[in-house]
Amino acid sequence: MLAAAAGLISFSASGTPVCQTVRLADDRITCEVSAPPGTDLAPVLDTLPIAMRSAMELVGVPEPPAHLALQVLPPPSFLKRLKALFQVDAFAMQAGDEIRLYPGREPLKLAFRLGHELTHWLVYKRHPARPPLWLDEGLAQQGGSAAAEVRARTLKQDLARPLPDQLAGNLFTLEELTGLRDYPRRAARSAAFYWQAEALANALRRRLGPGEFQAFIGLVSVPQPPDWRVLLRERWYFSDWDMDWLAGQIQPAAGRKQP
């Protein structure tokens, strides 16, 4: 990938790379990666194809031509002031056809954040109305997890994803989780939401299979979506037992790790 894109690099007057064009998915996706002068783009460029493949396996490929701007940022000043309180290893935010990324220093956390936001971007491209909140974030968590797992294998590292702190006291029921319209505000409650959203998305993908799961995403990602439970019952013949099974999948069993 890097060799193929070698002729697509722009240079500043000092010879420092500031922008690189990467083409993915058989040239159906063009990604313009930009960064301040002197930035080492190698970690991002090594991770980008892995993260994009992980996201595409979940959501599918957007209609070409698809263009994405990936802006690599230095750590903002407020993080320097708060460094004594907490350490952010990587963060990113997707808005339209742009992702702003601070890659940090941990390659697995970079892979997770990039996979998470690329999944959001692919959902935005394929389903502009967006799925329900729980599914939107559950998919993004799946994409991030898959990217981190692949990156861990390429680096021959172990990927540890322990359960969130205080999970047991902040869990949602299935009805509560799928009824959320806004993000939880408390940190422990938010961590439970993301964990459970990923667990529910994983359970549905396992039960439906990858192709039917993508069909499910499309059917609920419309301006006036059907009740997802009725949809599962009528199209995929889910029974009361199946719904109870789903409810159990978002509750951590003894010794169970991150989904």
Predicted regions and their residues:
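N-terminal export leaders
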Residues: M1-L2
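Short, strongly hydrophobic alpha-helical membrane anchors
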Residues: A6-G7
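N-terminal signal peptide c-region/cleavage motif recognized by signal peptidases
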Residues: S10-S14
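Juxtacatalytic substrate-recognition/specificity segment
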Residues: P17-P132, P226-V230
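Acidic/His/Gly-enriched intrinsically disordered linker/tail segments
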Residues: V88-A95, K109, H127-P259
